[in-house]
Design a protein with these regions (language model features):
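Active-site loop of short-chain dehydrogenase/reductase
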Residues: 7, 30, 56, 83-84, ...
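Catalytic loop of short-chain dehydrogenase/reductase
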Residues: 140-164, 170, 174
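Conserved glycine-rich Rossmann-like NAD(P)H-binding loop of the short-chain dehydrogenase/reductase
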Residues: 29-45
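Conserved glycine-rich cofactor-binding loop
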Residues: 8, 15-17
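Substrate-binding pocket helix/loop in short-chain dehydrogenase/reductase
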Residues: 98-100, 104-109
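The beta1-alpha1 cofactor-binding region of Rossmann-like NAD(H)/NADP(H)-dependent oxidoreductases
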Residues: 40-41, 61-72, 105
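C-terminal helical subdomain
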Residues: 184, 196-237
Length: 270
């Protein structure tokens, strides 16, 4: 299992909630941490709290909807640390809970610009530099249980954005060299400020969540999971797919004749 002692970690959306809890967890492992988000006062308070716990932490304002902000974050991180060992692509926002037939397209674009394109920008900009850096690194993006199943009524816009993050991570895993661990962090219901206080109190604490997923990140897992019962919902989805295959497209000898992955592998030189 990998040690993050003396590592350098960048976390977007790192001043509150899951991002802040992960900043503490990495810091307690001995890592140097840079947290980023648009609100300077939240960053200042978060870094002060981290430093009170003896964590080497710095901050930079960053709006993940702007590529130039993420480029500036990368510039600052490499200048501050000399190298970046971990990126936690965490910044995210809620979408209005409205059905597809009633949601304004402006609201849909807004949630995708942060939750998906913000993570795409982070992965592209930091990923390129990590490849050039050439040393062991980790690039994790925060999805959701809604990357796999519907758990909240009328949360289709948010769910679609988190499904898109899953797709990005799965593709990125194949594109990145072996020395870069790429994975999806999969929170269930975590009690953060994204939820109203009476509701948030019912969820897993952000610190507990970080404690559960940190060993998985250290181990380079494809998925870093938490809420145990969610496997029931995930299994239900794939059982439904399997049932349809068994009924309408059952396996047969030589059924890999149209398998695209096999075709692509055969076309590779050598």
């Amino acid at each position: 299992m990998r040690s993050f002692e003396h590592s350098s970690v960048v976390i977007t959306g790192g001043a509150t909630g899951i991002g802040f809890a992960l900043a503490k967890a990495f810091g307690k492992e001995g890592a140097r941490v840079m947290i980023a988000e648009p609100r300077q006062h939240r960053l200042e308070g978060a870094v002060a709290s981290l430093r009170e716990e003896g964590i080497n932490a710095v901050w930079l304002t960053c709006d993940v909807t702007k590529s130039e902000d993420i480029e500036a974050l990368a510039d600052s991180a490499w200048s501050e640390f000399g190298a970046v060992d971990v990126l936690i692509n965490n910044a995210g926002i809620k979408a209005p809970n409205r059905p597809v037939t009633e949601l304004d397209m402006e609201d849909l674009h807004a949630v995708f610009d942060v939750n998906f394109f913000g993570m795409w920008r982070g992965a592209a900009i930091f990923g390129k530099r990590m490849v050039e850096q050439g040393s062991r690194a980790s690039l994790y993006s925060v999805g959701s249980e809604l990357s796999f199943f519907s758990s909240v009524p009328n949360a289709t816009a948010y769910m679609a954005s988190k499904h898109a993050v899953l797709g990005m991570v799965e593709g990125l895993r194949e594109e990145m060299p072996d020395f870069i661990d790429v994975g999806l962090i999969v929170p269930g219901f975590v009690g953060t400020e994204m939820h109203a206080k009476p509701v948030a109190s019912l969820g897993m604490s952000a610190d507990q969540f970080a404690e559960v997923v940190m060993p998985q990140i250290k181990n380079g897992e494809r998925f870093a999971v938490s809420h145990a019962f969610n496997i029931e919902h995930i299994t239900e989805r794939y059982e439904a797919i399997s049932k349809v295959y068994e009924t309408y497209a059952p396996r047969y000898e030589g059924d890999d004749e149209f398998d695209v992955k096999a075709m692509m592998a055969r076309r590779k030189p050598g």
